[in-house]
Amino acid sequence: MNCVRVLRVTSLLTFGVFAAYAQPGAERAAAQTEPILVYNAQHASLTQAWVNGFTRDTGIKVTVRNGSDAELGNQLVQEGSLSPADVFLTENSPAMTLVDAAGLFAPVNPDTLTQVREGFRPSDGRWVGIAARTTVFAYNKNRLTPAQLPKSLLDLADPAWKRRWGASPTGADFQAIASALLEIKGEAATAAWLKAMKQNAVAFRGNVAAMKGVNSGEIEGAVIYQYYYFGDQARTGENSNNTALHYFKNRDPGAFVSVSGGGVLASSKRAAQAQTFLKWVTGKGGQDILRTGDSYEYAVGIGAQSNPKLVPLADLQAPDVNPSKLNSKKVIALMMEAGLL
């Protein structure tokens, strides 16, 4: 009887020891089988196409939480190391810079970084470009001739353009454009331009609304990204048939190409799977979706081709802007001073 008791106690103790050692491994295994969580500020349809392709190719499941650049970037900063997110995807790079400055990103795997063209990834390697879009001046073909178009984004500060053009100043897209202006021309020139914009521009709630304003003739032109036009043309064209695109080129601030970014959170419990996701998005599978899909954003992978309807990246003559230098906080402060926010 005593032997039985000893055996039972020994067995329980042995089980307890094994359980104690097995628990961390069990937790890791559970974390590896759970879906990775992506905080997504990119267009939901594009990210869903990436998620579908990634899960099909790897078997790794993904949960997506959608929001805006500013909303999710600030949420990550507030959550800090307690964030449940594994990956952050944005439309524009200032939100990536915000999270990076808070020290919340893990280094991106080198074999992912080397898939992406130089200039579409920051030098610190803590996030990487996943797509890009270019600034354009969408104009009403019935109200402006090519000879009447502004030669530079800066020309729109001229009183001659008063109430003739528009933009969506509250959106992350325009704030990224203003951030590029700040990086290229400096604070004084940017502040002056934004104050002139307050006097001259018609403010819209969103880039689609601004393009509709151009198409209807409410305004003659608007500063937007190119994919709004191409997306509408691919559908019905009802919001863009009277519209054409003017590319500023010549390294002008109005030729700014904005980088959409992706990064893995340092606090991720599924870091390996998160890194695999980022590698897939920047690799052939993810970049081919940009070429064949209906997002009309530019591919940034080395050797990757963009949608053939787009003006090639090499022909845009974009200014050289380090995506990690775009200062969203300073731009928002300048826009508030100008009365735009």
Mark where each language-model region is:
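Extracytoplasmic ligand-binding site segments that recognize negatively charged/polar headgroups
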Residues: 41-48, 67-71, 77, 84-219, ...
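Periplasmic-binding protein-like
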Residues: 161-168, 280-304
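Short amphipathic alpha-helical coupling segments at ligand-binding clamshell hinges
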Residues: 50, 189-193, 260, 269-281, ...
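Conserved N-terminal structural module of periplasmic/extracytoplasmic solute-binding proteins
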Residues: 23-87
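A ligand-binding cleft/hinge motif common to bilobed small-molecule-binding domains
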Residues: 94-98, 221-242
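An extracytoplasmic/periplasmic, membrane-proximal ligand-sensing/linker region
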Residues: 188, 295-341
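Short, low-complexity disordered leader/linker segments with a strong preference
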Residues: 1-35
